[in-house]
Swiss-Prot record:
Positions of glycan attachment: N5, N21, N346
Bilayer-spanning residue ranges: 83-103, 155-175, 188-208, 212-232, 324-344, 354-374, 422-442, 457-477, 491-511, 523-543, 560-582, 591-611
Protein's organism: Sclerotinia sclerotiorum (strain ATCC 18683 / 1980 / Ss-1)
CDD domains named in the record: MFS_Atg22_like
Lineage: Eukaryota, Fungi, Dikarya, Ascomycota, Pezizomycotina
A single GO BP: amino acid transmembrane export from vacuole
Biased composition (Basic and acidic residues): 39-60
Alphabetized Pfam families for the sequence: ATG22 (PF11700)
Protein name: Autophagy-related protein 22-2
Gene designation per UniProt: atg22-2
Amino acid sequence: MVPRNFSESQLRPEPERAPSNSTKISYRSHSSSFEADDERSSSADHDSMGPDIGSAHRDVPAQYAGEDTRLTSRKELSGWYAYGFAAEVFVICGIGSFIPITLEQLARENGVLLSDPTQPCGSSSTHLPPGLHPGSAKDSQCVIYLGGLQINTASFAMYSFSLSVLFQAILVVSISCAADHGNYRKRLLLFFAFAGSITTMLFLTVVPKVYLLGALWAIISNTCFGASFVLLNSFLPLLVRHHPKAQYGTPDFSPEFRPSSVDESPPEHSLNEPEVAVYDERSALLAHNRISSQASDVAEPFPLSKDSTSIELQLSTQISSTGIGIGYSAGLFLQCVSIVIIWLLNGTTFSLRLVLFFIGLWWFLFTIPAALWLRPRPGPPLPHTGGENSKGSRSWLAYTIYAWSSLFRTVKLARRLKDITFFLAAWFLLSDAIATVSGTAVLYAKTQLRMAPEALGLINVIATTAGVLGAFSWAAISRTLNLKPHQTILACICIFEMIPLYGLLGFLPIVKRWNVVGLQQPWEMYPLGFVYGFVLGGLSSYCRSLFGELIPPGSEAAFYALYAITDKGSSVFGPAIVGAIVDRTGEIRPAFWFLAVLVGLPAPLIYFVNVERGKKEGAKLAEIIEGFKIKDAESAGEGSRGSSIDHESGQNEGLIYPRVGENAGRGRNDI
């Protein structure tokens, strides 16, 4: 927090852009009743957050009514980070740890032994005697009967997760258009955040007799979480595009700077003049002091130099990694609190439900800062529907229909993009592996290794700590080894493959005789938890930022919806297949064969991803989509108006792409 000690008359001049032809013309939005009051006026620039380059107003022609292209502010970035701090605890502590074991425990208290249907199962800590080899535990498996089907209690949790992912995928597609067009991006984010957090708190009301209600709350909360994070991800390219470092060009974040001047002629400097404070990846977006009272608060770089990796990709990776690290830190803290609660209450089912209540409460409370600080960043009006004149159910029906039709069209066009196709195919498999390995490991530790809930929570603490370390370390590792983003992802995959392969060692007769190694002892889960977390910290940030670099500009939410469908949609299959394997064999260990294949398959696909080629193909795709939009506008009787808008401002009904003639020989500088 920086104290404000200067008046309105001391406002710094508007920053002068460095000569660069790679960024878009933009202007300050005066719209959105949904953004915080302190983000709507010039006086807001003097808040407690300190002087902020992100508040600079740029009075240039608008590309569509209500567009907000103010520079990204420190407060806005804080809002983006705040939601990660709020919601990551759900996926780390909830989905990644306590929701699966709570569902399994609730089902177990209503189940019977597979070997003796007249015998109730009891708790998971009593059904398998100490020292009993997991391979001989088939007769001790617990099952429930649901709709005439016999389901293993571990499979019940996996099936619940698969079902939640299915609904999540459908919802993500349906809301993608509302996020891309109009002023719904932030509203939907907050709606799903509060709905998901409240549903998570409702786990406190679930008792064993109504264990199916627990599955319902899990489905709703996970669906809301996934939808909210898709909306959060759609903010990332916009935050990067309008970030001062991207707009004013600071390659490698270590450029030479010159003070901006109100005069168009370059200022003359003396060698003994004090330097102007500059921004780098280690400094806040706000200057905490003024090196010279004569210098402007805003520093302007020299023209951009060519770099093998774009400024946007570096910045996107930095912001994404920081967000992941902040979220993991929150998850780590709450996980430790949860372990204490479970230990104090002796690991009862009530203690698990109480922990889930606190997870939902955390999610709810820390969403409030995001609601206050995050700007809506509205998109253009929805084409052919009358824009804001369409209201109520008809408006939402139009958004939903348009979203699905746009998805099918986007999929058809995306097939022409070689690198996006490679990446999405790899991400389909990789994200499924990430989700399935996590759930399978937790349930294996609970049912096969008889680990208590607090011990399972400790595994997650280790994984989360490693995730924080990985989120901040992989960037340094990548720089040290001079790895490209896709090579960093490949390194993560190779390490990730160690987890299922280690579990498969338990099938070797010689290893079985050792009664250790190959996940035969509970302590073995802890080092594997570290490996999982460290790898996930790198994959989460690098995959998200790499895909952001390939997205055609102006359609972020739609393409991130496709990213999320590929991500969450794939997770319908992995847990369901593992559940089927468990139901068939009575054990979880055979599922490691499936996981080993699932983790390894994405590697060759990621290997062929080329970012620079993908960016060029994205520019071509932009022109193709633009042609579709013009054709649709003409067929709706709006051809003349659409052509006028297109020629005058380069905007075409919500998809903003470079004009072919204007951008010949120009590299794209936004993601």
